[in-house]
Curated annotation (Swiss-Prot):
GO terms for molecular function: NADP binding; phosphogluconate dehydrogenase (decarboxylating) activity. GO terms for cellular component: cytosol. Its EC number is 1.1.1.44. Substrate binds at residues 104, 130-132, 187-188, 192, 259, 286, 445, 451. NADP(+) binds at residues 11-16, 34-36, 76-78, 104. The gene is Pgd. This is 6-phosphogluconate dehydrogenase, decarboxylating. It comes from Drosophila melanogaster (Fruit fly).
Length: 481
């Protein structure tokens, strides 16, 4: 029978299968396709048995089974695989049909695909999908962007299958071009930051001699207050987990992997000139963890401080760690939203920052109560330049900064690496400093490269000084540093 499916989904790895089952559960007829056709038959005979899901044995067969305008979602590996499928789909589709890329594609690729397909009359959507396998099955956070004309066509499906927070769907149109995938990239970068901050809190507690159960209890307490979040919750569960050999966490090799989206966020921050320092440190911390053999060798020859980790009042210091984690988390999100704001300005995206915070409230890895406070901040002040300037977050840091400073200072004294906690504190202090030592930096640049400088009160007028009396008076035009 032709024209019976509401949407087709290409790619039957776990995420693809679970999204199909989610759509089916919400009443949509889905056509499943995979490059390896045997996988389609296997899926229909097992996971999709007794559902309305139908299969296709070729792209032509798949397209013939779709209602018009046709909607095809790709959940395949980012990069050339997406372009290959698009190339094969183009001759089979008609003007007004929609192709959706639900993978972790680079936002520049999504922008390019939008431009290319617009010339052919096809609508393209690049959608971030967050929440992992469980989210895909029971309600992910969805961040669609691209050709806005596609939104009314996919909105009923996307808002039916997504997670809900306080009854509102964790899915809304993000913006043109690569906006959806850019927001998903920043989400993943913030996820890197959150995880690193939690790891540093764990490292400090472990150095103080807390047992796995004691640390789990502490994370459990934090999860019932302002740090209530998915990542804090699973950290508690991981710490408590035992198998036949005891606590599993202690036997896991301390080398962290990464798929690249955190790195993309750090690169984008450099490209847009936004100091997203915490996410950068989170990425570099994973790189450092990968140097396991070198670290083991260095640990036996490089000396640290003689001071051991100990405090007079453990209960109070554990509370200090909680406040430090919360304050640094505020900075991480402030930096992420700074990056989105600058990218939106340069790409002429109309991003709804409160809406983005709501999209992240449910279904995704960084879901937390905290995001509700961010939504409130941008709802009351849509043009807010930085979350740190919002009254709620300003007061939170005022309450917690003494604890934050105490934790970072002690970690330094004890030789415990806290790159994320400390870079967040440095950013906070830099952001609140009216006059930074960049005047000296600019003078140095002018000294060796004749790069000129502005004088206070004479902004826009550039001066060069012959610092040695032997150089010239001409400013530089090519040499940059």
């Amino acid at each position: 029978m032709s024209g019976q499916a509401d949407i087709a989904l290409i790619g039957l790895a776990v995420m693809g299968q679970n999204l199909i089952l989610n759509m089916d559960e919400k009443g949509f007829v889905v056509c499943a396709y995979n490059r390896t056709v045997a996988k389609v038959k296997e899926f229909l005979a097992n996971e999709a048995k007794d559902t309305k899901v139908i299969g296709a044995d070729s792209l032509e067969d798949m397209v013939s089974k779709l209602k018009s305008p046709r909607k095809v979602m790709l959940l395949v590996k980012a990069g050339s695989a997406v372009d290959d499928f698009i190339q094969q789909l183009v001759p089979l589709l008609s003007a007004g049909d929609v192709i959706i890329d639900g993978g972790n594609s680079e936002y520049q690729d999504t922008s390019r695909r939008c431009d290319e397909l617009a010339k052919l009359g096809l609508l393209f959507v690049g959608s971030g999908v967050s929440g992992g396998e469980e989210g895909a099955r029971h309600g992910p956070s969805l961040m669609p962007g691209g050709h806005e004309a596609a939104w009314p066509l996919i909105q009923p499906i996307f808002q039916a299958i997504c997670a809900k927070a306080d009854g509102e769907p964790c899915c809304e149109w993000v913006g043109d071009g690569g906006a959806g995938h850019f927001v998903k990239m920043v989400h993943n970068g913030i996820e890197y930051g959150d995880m690193q901050l939690i790891c540093e809190a764990y490292h400090i507690m472990k150095s103080l001699g807390l047992s796995a159960d004691q640390m789990a209890d502490e994370f459990g307490k934090w999860n019932s207050a302002e740090l209530d979040s998915f990542l804090i919750e699973i950290t508690r569960d991981i710490l408590k987990y035992k198998d036949g050999k005891g606590y599993l966490l202690e036997r896991i090799r301390d080398t962290a992997g990464q798929k690249g989206t955190g790195k993309w966020t750090a690169i984008a921050a450099l490209q847009y000139g936004v100091p997203v320092t915490l996410i950068g440190e989170a990425v570099f911390s994973r790189c450092l963890s990968a140097l396991k053999d070198e670290r083991v060798q260095a640990s036996s020859v490089l000396k640290g401080p003689s001071t051991k980790a100990q405090v007079a009042n453990l209960t109070k210091f554990l509370d200090d760690i909680k406040h430090a984690l919360y304050c640094a988390k505020i900075v991480s999100y402030a930096q992420g939203f700074m990056l989105m704001r600058e990218a939106a300005r340069e790409n002429k995206w109309r991003l709804n920052y409160g809406g983005i915070a709501l999209m992240w409230r449910g279904g995704c890895i960084i879901r937390s109560v905290f995001l509700g406070n961010i939504k409130d901040a941008y709802t009351s002040q849509p043009e807010l330049s930085n979350l740190l300037l919002d009254d709620f977050f300003k007061k939170a840091i005022e309450r917690g900064q003494d604890s934050w400073r105490e934790v970072v200072a002690n970690a330094f004294r004890w030789g415990i690496p806290v790159p994320a906690l400390s870079t967040a504190l440095s950013f906070y202090d830099g952001y609140r400093t009216a006059k930074l030592p960049a005047n000296l930096l600019q003078a140095q640049r002018d000294y060796f490269g004749a790069h000129t400088y502005e004088l206070l009160g004479q902004e826009g007028q550039f001066h060069h000084t012959n610092w040695t009396g032997t150089g010239g008076n001409v400013s530089a035009s090519t040499y940059q540093a």
